[in-house]
């Protein structure tokens, strides 16, 4: 028996090889196989958003004006979610709702579903792009792993949360003021700021900002003066073999400041990766919990005492009253299809009123 050892080579290129050569060619903007997903989806998502914010009203779904054409500006324009009556329909242009009528499709909120789904696939394509490029230049894939944090947040907020509710209607609309309204909704209906997963998310994002500021300042403070100018832009070149800054000096400085400091760059930079990504993952998990209507912390003893004693209030009980006010005022305005009417005497008032 003969065993052939060596690399198998094909005599001629097939279609796959030709596509692989073209897609992964070294050019100014790398395309790659991931680009087949990223570029079309990003193009359609952005195009749908610009189209919706420019021309499409939300009168039929939310009773609102939401386009530049109706007088909105960049902060108030939005691509709004479909009507609550449409539940979780994919709202395909050729589906039973729009029946191929583009104008009707826009009026029903079809652009939101279009932007949300293409946006999610575009983000996934961007993560795959980082995997593909890292493999091509023989890097570790930590950039792609880090980008899973924003993807988890986007998918949980825009897709999983409304899937757990009665319809896409309860997802955020794509606009600045619309996102602010959604945040108020989250606070009023889910007490989101007292949710431990939100707390971990805030700690991760703000902690990452602090770490970035400290790290950047420390590197700038400990640059080696081995060029014609001791600053980032003049003294060093991207192909130098020497270190740019002194880790030893930085370690000594922070050891004196805090009593402890990072002793090597690997642990330091892994920590800078770990803090924000874990925070984003935790907040995404929290939103998945909200999709199932899981509750935040409840301090029932304080609520009972506040109900019995008009002079007893804590910041917690005041916030609970605020949440009740958000629900009472927001539900009627935010869900006009429900025809909710709250008499003045049932609207919540603080103990001081």
From Swiss-Prot:
Keyword hit for Signal: no
GO-annotated molecular function: chlorophyll binding; electron transporter, transferring electrons within the cyclic electron transport pathway of photosynthesis activity; iron ion binding; oxygen evolving activity
Location(s) in or outside the cell: Plastid, Chloroplast thylakoid membrane
N-acetylthreonine found at: 2
Entry binding sites for pheophytin a: 130, 143
Keyword Cytoplasm: no
Binding of chlorophyll a PD2, residues: 198
Keywords of the record: Acetylation, Chlorophyll, Chloroplast, Chromophore, Electron transport, Iron, Magnesium, Membrane, Metal-binding, Oxidoreductase, Phosphoprotein, Photosynthesis, Photosystem II, Plastid, Thylakoid, Transmembrane, Transmembrane helix, Transport
Residues the entry annotates as binding chlorophyll a ChlzD2: 118
Cofactor details (free text): The D1/D2 heterodimer binds P680, chlorophylls that are the primary electron donor of PSII, and subsequent electron acceptors. It shares a non-heme iron and each subunit binds pheophytin, quinone, additional chlorophylls, carotenoids and lipids. There is also a Cl(-1) ion associated with D1 and D2, which is required for oxygen evolution. The PSII complex binds additional chlorophylls, carotenoids and specific lipids.
GO annotation, cellular component aspect: chloroplast thylakoid membrane; photosystem II
Reaction(s) this enzyme catalyzes, per UniProt: 2 a plastoquinone + 4 hnu + 2 H2O = 2 a plastoquinol + O2
Any Gene Ontology biological process: photosynthetic electron transport in photosystem II
Residues bearing the modification Phosphothreonine: 2
Membrane-related topology note: Multi-pass membrane protein
Binding site for a plastoquinone: 215, 262
Record-listed Fe cation binding positions: 215, 269
Family: Belongs to the reaction center PufL/M/PsbA/D family.
Miscellaneous remark of the record: 2 of the reaction center chlorophylls (ChlD1 and ChlD2) are entirely coordinated by water.
Record note on quaternary structure: PSII is composed of 1 copy each of membrane proteins PsbA, PsbB, PsbC, PsbD, PsbE, PsbF, PsbH, PsbI, PsbJ, PsbK, PsbL, PsbM, PsbT, PsbX, PsbY, PsbZ, Psb30/Ycf12, at least 3 peripheral proteins of the oxygen-evolving complex and a large number of cofactors. It forms dimeric complexes.
UniProt cross-references to HAMAP family, sorted A to Z: PSII_PsbD_D2
Reported function: Photosystem II (PSII) is a light-driven water:plastoquinone oxidoreductase that uses light energy to abstract electrons from H(2)O, generating O(2) and a proton gradient subsequently used for ATP formation. It consists of a core antenna complex that captures photons, and an electron transfer chain that converts photonic excitation into a charge separation. The D1/D2 (PsbA/PsbD) reaction center heterodimer binds P680, the primary electron donor of PSII as well as several subsequent electron acceptors. D2 is needed for assembly of a stable PSII complex.
Protein name: Photosystem II D2 protein
Organism: Spinacia oleracea
């Amino acid at each position: 028996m003969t065993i052939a050892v060596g690399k198998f080579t094909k005599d001629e290129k097939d279609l796959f090889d030709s596509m692989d050569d073209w897609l992964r060619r070294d050019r100014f903007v790398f395309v790659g196989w991931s680009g087949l997903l990223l570029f079309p989806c990003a193009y359609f998502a952005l195009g749908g958003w610009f189209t919706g914010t420019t021309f499409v009203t939300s009168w039929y779904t939310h009773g609102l004006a939401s386009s530049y054409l109706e007088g909105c500006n960049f902060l108030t324009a939005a691509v709004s979610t479909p009507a609550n009556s449409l539940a979780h329909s994919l709202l395909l242009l050729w589906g039973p709702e729009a029946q191929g009528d583009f104008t009707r499709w826009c009026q029903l909120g079809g652009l939101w579903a279009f932007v949300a789904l293409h946006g999610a696939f575009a983000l996934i394509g961007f993560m795959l792009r980082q995997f593909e490029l890292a493999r091509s230049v023989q890097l570790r894939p930590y950039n792609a792993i880090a980008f899973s944090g924003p993807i988890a947040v986007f998918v949980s907020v825009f897709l999983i949360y409304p899937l757990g509710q009665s319809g896409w209607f309860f997802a955020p609309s794509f606009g600045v003021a619309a996102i602010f309204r959604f945040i108020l909704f989250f606070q009023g209906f889910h007490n989101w700021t007292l949710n431990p997963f939100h707390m971990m998310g805030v700690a991760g994002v703000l902690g990452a900002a602090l770490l970035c500021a400290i790290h950047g300042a420390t590197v700038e403070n400990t640059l080696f003066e081995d060029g014609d100018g001791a600053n980032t832009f003049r003294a060093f070149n991207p192909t130098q073999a020497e270190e740019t800054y002194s880790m030893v000096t930085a370690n000594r400085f922070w050891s004196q400041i805090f009593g402890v400091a990072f002793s090597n760059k690997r642990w330091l930079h892994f920590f800078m990766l770990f803090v924000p990504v874990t925070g984003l993952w935790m907040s995404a998990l929290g939103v998945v919990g909200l999709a199932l209507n899981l509750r935040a912390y409840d301090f029932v003893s304080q609520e009972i005492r506040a109900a019995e004693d008009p002079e007893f209030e804590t910041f917690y009980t005041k916030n609970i009253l605020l949440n009740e006010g958000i629900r009472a005022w927001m539900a009627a305005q935010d869900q006009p299809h429900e025809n909710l009417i709250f008499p003045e005497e049932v609207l919540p008032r603080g103990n001081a009123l």
